[in-house]
Amino acid sequence: MEVSLNDPASNKTSAKSNSSAFFYFESCQSPSLALLLLLIAYTVVLIMGICGNLSLITIIFKKQREAQNVTNILIANLSLSDILVCVMCIPFTAIYTLMDRWIFGNTMCKLTSYVQSVSISVSIFSLVLIAIERYQLIVNPRGWKPSASHAYWGIMLIWLFSLLLSIPLLLSYHLTDEPFRNLSLPTDLYSHHVVCVEHWPSKTNQLLYSTSLIMLQYFVPLGFMFICYLKIVICLHKRNSKIDRRRENESRLTENKRINTMLISIVVTFAACWLPLNTFNVIFDWYHEVLMSCHHDLVFAICHLVAMVSTCINPLFYGFLNRNFQKDLVVLIHHCLCFALRERYENIAISTLHTDESKGSLRVAHIPAGI
């Protein structure tokens, strides 16, 4: 979603775009321990997000060769966009927040903000497509059923829409040293320091775009998914009641309860992970004076970190709580371990062979000439 651009991951003007944001710069520094813990947390989320989503994509790719599955196609797209979020949001945001300046150049200033917004949009719209697919599967099983081709078309459309939606960010971001010009600290220390911020023709344009973006990247998808999953839960509850009256198949009733829990968890987790960051962004856009304090950057980083946790939780809900995916994951890990052991064994065998050949060569070289 819209990430406040205190960092490149944000889709908004940073507090650094105004030199007054540095009023506390000389006397206020984030605690070293807090920054260290933040860096460790970012690293853990980055590793878990990439590994979890790569595992899902690998498993789905193998299963897709056996049979085309709409749900798996959409989950793979979600995982791909989540990987982009991990790669393009977490490292740049962490470094920018810790260093308090932008070090990656003007091109990356524009590109990272653009790619981050695109990947975040794709992740959220992928969740919407999954909600639609599950709604049709459970609530309206006799109606229109999305096919694999429909899934691919849907994926193409959300990528195209996300690319177009984020173009204003590509055009508005630039580098500036303005926040460092009026510091009372030695100017030599900050002579080459710059920040990556948005620049709009007017505050009205910036507010209009940022508000529209946060609506499209958070509130509208959340409301849509809430309605879809609410109808799904109601539908499953009615089926559970029928099963109770007929005293049929208790295992099916248990499975439906598990699905209910998972669906509710999906919506709650999505809303909870992104709520702090979007709240921060709304406050910054409309009441930014409230945020001009010592720990502004630290508060932003914590909110951003919580949002990034969603990239780790999505594989959990959409894959690892699925029994079939659990089995496939075990098989994947087994194959990886076996491959590693086989490679090691072959290397040892080749090394031994070379050693034996060397010894043989030495023995031949020392055979007396008269024999």
Swiss-Prot record:
Xref: InterPro entries: GPCR_Rhodpsn, GPCR_Rhodpsn_7TM, NeuroY6_rcpt, NPY_rcpt
Alphabetical list of Pfam families matching this protein: 7tm_1
Tissue: Expressed in hippocampus, striatum, hypothalamus, cerebellum, small intestine, colon and adrenal gland.
Entry membrane topology: Multi-pass membrane protein
One Gene Ontology term, aspect cellular component: neuron projection
Chief localisation class: membrane
Residues bearing carbohydrate: N11, N18, N182
Keywords per UniProt: Cell membrane, Disulfide bond, G-protein coupled receptor, Glycoprotein, Lipoprotein, Membrane, Palmitate, Receptor, Transducer, Transmembrane, Transmembrane helix
Cystine bridges: C109-C196
Subcellular location: Cell membrane
Positions of transmembrane segments: 32-52, 73-93, 112-132, 151-171, 214-234, 264-284, 298-318
GO MF term (any one): neuropeptide Y receptor activity
Lipid-modified residues, S-palmitoyl cysteine kind: C336
Ranges of the Extracellular topological domain: 1-31, 94-111, 172-213, 285-297
Topology, Cytoplasmic side: 53-72, 133-150, 235-263, 319-371
Function recorded in the entry: Receptor for neuropeptide Y and peptide YY. The activity of this receptor is mediated by G proteins that inhibit adenylate cyclase activity.
Family: Belongs to the G-protein coupled receptor 1 family.
Protein name as catalogued: Neuropeptide Y receptor type 6
Annotated source species: Oryctolagus cuniculus
